[in-house]
Amino acid sequence: MVVLMRERSEIISWLTDMDGVLWHEGKAIPGAPELIKKWLEAETKFLVLTNNSIYTPHDLSIRLKSGGLNVPESLIYTSAMATADFLNHQSPRSTAYVIGENGLITAMHEIGYVFTESKPEYVVLGETRNLSFDSLTKAARFINAGSKFIATNPDATGPSKDGVLLATGSVAALLTRATGKDPYIVGKPNPMMFRSAMRKIGAHSETTAMIGDRMDTDVVAGI
């Protein structure tokens, strides 16, 4: 049997994770500032991808800069933005019940979605530090009544200096247990987020590489 191996294309564009690759506990990882600087100076196509839906790209750019990383907000793409792009394509200017922070709320407002507690078409779950029993109960009832269940990302936990933090995946599991409905997850490792990211910078999959640290999100999708 003859196996023909296709020659790999030259990598000219990059997608990179943020936490654990460029950034850890409020500081740039050694070598990351130099890499970003090199890419910017060479006008290399790249985009920072993160499943963090709490912050807007503007917020993240400021936070990264405070830790020594100069990443323009235009080169940051979050799971909240990917979720908004997905919903804008599926059902433009529709309605949603949203559990999340400023990053998700801003992204949803920017596509013209109306937030409502009256028969929303979607229940959209993002990462949040302000969960309440009331909001979870409402979400479960809307899902049981027919609202489509969307989650920004599958990560069950996130990092912090004090240990793990509960993240979107854990809350989604709770709602799934309560409703019997699994969410459609937009963020990594969903290939759709990567396709959207590549379109954003005019890149092609054959000449783009993914840099990540998590096998279950970054590496799986990169393959």
Q: What do the predicted segments below correspond to?
A:
Residues 15-16, 32, 36-64, 76, ...:
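Substrate-recognition element of Asp-dependent hydrolases with the DxDx(T/V) motif
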Residues 71, 91-94, 203-206:
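Short helix-loop-beta connector
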Residues 73-82, 118-121, 154:
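A short, structured active-site edge motif that brings together acidic residues
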Residues 115, 133-155:
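A short, gly/pro- and small-residue-rich
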Residues 183-220:
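Conserved Lys-Pro-Asp/Glu-containing loop-to-beta segment of HAD-superfamily phosphomonoesterases
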